[in-house]
Amino acid sequence: MGGIIRAFQWAFDPSVEQIGGPTVVPRSNQWSGVLDFFLQSNHDHGSAAHLLTSGGADIVAPATLRGANRLNVAPTFNYSAFFYAGGVFHSALTGAYLELYVEEFDTAGNFVRGIDIGHFEIGYWDGWWLSGSRTWGAGGNSWVIPQNGTVAVTQGFLYRVWLDLHGDIRADGWGVFGGSGAISQAQVRFVQFDWSIDPA
C-alpha cells in the first residue's frame, strides 16, 4: 500500500540558536509548501546562528497489517540558495542542508521514537582566509532525498514524516585588522511525499 501527500499538515519553527546578534529572518510558509530563511553575520563582532524550519505530514499504518513491514518515504522538492563567506586573517562558515526525519507514535498517541532517514546538502563552506571570499548560488527542480534508514512499521501506529531545512552561519565580524562575514539563505518548495508500506 502507499500514496502521495502533496501538502504539509504540520509546521515546526523552533527558536533560532544564535549568539552575537546576527540578522535572522525566518520566512517559511509551510501551508504554501515553502521552507525559507535568511541569515547574515553581525558586521561589528563575532556571531553565529543555526536555524531549523520544518514541514510534516502523517501516515497511519493500517491495523490490518500482518508480518514485518517497513515504511519507505521519498520527498520531492525544488530549491534555490545563496551563500557568502569571506575574511581577512579570519574564518567563516555558511551552509544549508535538508534532513528527512520520522517520528513514531503508538495507538494511544504516545511518542515512541525518532529516526533520521535521509540527508541532502544544499551548500557548505567552512574556511580561513589570508584575504579572500567565496560567493555562490545553488538550485534545482524535482530533487529527491534517497532514504538511507529503515523504518520498521507497527500496525495501527502513526508515522509523522518531517522535511527539515537547516541553515548555519558563523563569522568574526570586521575590525581594523581584518575579520570575516557570512550569509546563508535558502528556499525549498515542497512538491510531495511519495510513500509506501512494504513487506520487510
List the predicted regions and their residue ranges.
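Mature extracytoplasmic or otherwise solvent-exposed domains
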Residues: 1-200
